[in-house]
A protein has these predicted regions:
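Hydrophobic alpha-helical transmembrane segments
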Residues: 1-120, 311-320
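Secretory targeting signals
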Residues: 86-90, 94-97, 144-218, 230-233, ...
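Alpha-helical transmembrane segments of multi-pass membrane transporters/translocases
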Residues: 279-320
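Helix-loop-helix units of permease transmembrane domains in multi-pass membrane transporters
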Residues: 115-151
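Aromatic-rich transmembrane-lumenal/periplasmic boundary elements in polytopic membrane proteins
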Residues: 218-267
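Hydrophobic alpha-helical membrane-insertion segments
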Residues: 30-46, 149-155, 222-241
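Short alpha-helical transmembrane interface motifs in multi-pass membrane proteins
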Residues: 106-109, 185-190, 296-300
């Protein structure tokens, strides 16, 4: 009783000890998150940085390809072998990087469930609720632990990749700048969109598990909602634009229909990912940050931010 009375005296009573203990509890997820972070953007840019000097030297040696000396010929063959090996590593890293990003999305969901386990795991409710802390400490401590375990390593990985990008001489790959545009699109709009996508995933998952009460529902509902929201949103847009309700707003061209689907960017993490990939492929990654990443446009970014904040606020008031 005395401990509970002490907890009520402060808004964030014993926040730091509770937060550190929760991060320690989530140590397996933290280790996997760090591994996924290292294998994604930084590893990709590290291989690119190693490959750039090789491409530059091959470009310089190509000037003497018509009449090379024996030393130049041997150097050219050695560089070709090295480039072949590096390209094999790059392809393998792209596959591993994509799998790591998928794993990060999955572990973001798992970490949120484990951090807020008292909402769906009845076997630990009494133990968690008996701790001498108040509801604010419990909610924000759990949420801060999720951000530390999943979002912080992701953000640091993006920053490291941005630093490595500054040292990469991508002009040696092609004269049209296509490689440079693709790499900048991946390291810029796509990377930060993935970061915001994970934050929105945490918000939606937390809102749904706050009133589920069972582990099965807590696992199934966030996944179903993540798919259902963009599908229902897109179907509603198509129904309105096709004249079902008495008005034809746009022509029925496929390109127009796809272009009008951009609002699903703000509806869910899946919608954000779909429209980001579509934007990058439709312009060949050649464009501004807002062209490659719809989330950076105010008309989509602000609603996405409001939806995310609303989910966090709803979860807070439901849990508290």
């Amino acid at each position: 009783m005395t401990a509970q009375n002490s907890a009520n005296k402060s808004v964030f009573y014993k926040f730091l000890p509770y937060y550190l203990n929760k991060v320690k509890y989530l140590r397996p997820q933290l280790i996997m998150s760090i591994i996924f972070s290292v294998l994604s953007y930084p590893a990709f840019m590290l291989i690119i940085n190693i490959l750039c000097p090789v491409e530059r030297e091959l470009l310089e040696l190509s000037q003497y390809i018509s009449d090379p000396t024996p030393e130049q010929y041997e150097m050219n063959m050695a560089l070709l072998d090295k480039r072949s090996l590096l390209y094999s590593l790059l392809i393998a890293e792209i596959v591993i990087g994509v799998l790591s990003l998928v794993g990060r999305v999955i572990f973001t969901f798992v970490t949120t469930l484990r951090s807020f386990r008292c909402l769906h795991n009845k076997s630990v409710v009494d133990m968690d609720m008996s701790l001498p802390i108040n509801h604010n400490t419990r909610f924000f401590g759990d949420l801060a632990a999720v951000f530390t375990v999943n979002i912080l390593p992701h953000f640091i990985a993006i920053l490291l990749a941005q630093i490595l990008l500054q040292f990469a001489d991508l002009s040696a790959f092609d004269t049209q700048g296509e490689t440079q545009a693709i790499v900048h699109a991946i390291m810029g709009p796509m990377a930060f969109t993935g970061l915001f996508m994970c934050i929105m995933e945490i918000a939606i998952t937390l809102l749904l598990i706050s009133f589920c009460g069972r582990l099965a529902e807590a696992c199934i509902y966030p996944i179903l909602i993540n798919f259902a929201i963009p599908v229902i949103h897109l179907m509603t847009i198509n129904l309105v634009e096709s004249g079902v309700y008495g008005a034809v707003l746009y022509p029925s061209a496929i390109s127009t229909a796809v272009g009008s689907a951009y609002p699903i960017t703000a509806s869910s993490p899946l919608g954000m990912m779909i429209m980001t990939l579509y934007s990058m492929m439709s312009i060949g990654c050649k464009g501004s940050v807002s062209d490659c990443g719809p989330i950076f446009r105010p008309e989509f970014g602000i609603p996405a931010l409001l939806v995310t904040l609303a989910c966090f606020a709803g979860a807070y008031f439901l849990i508290i």
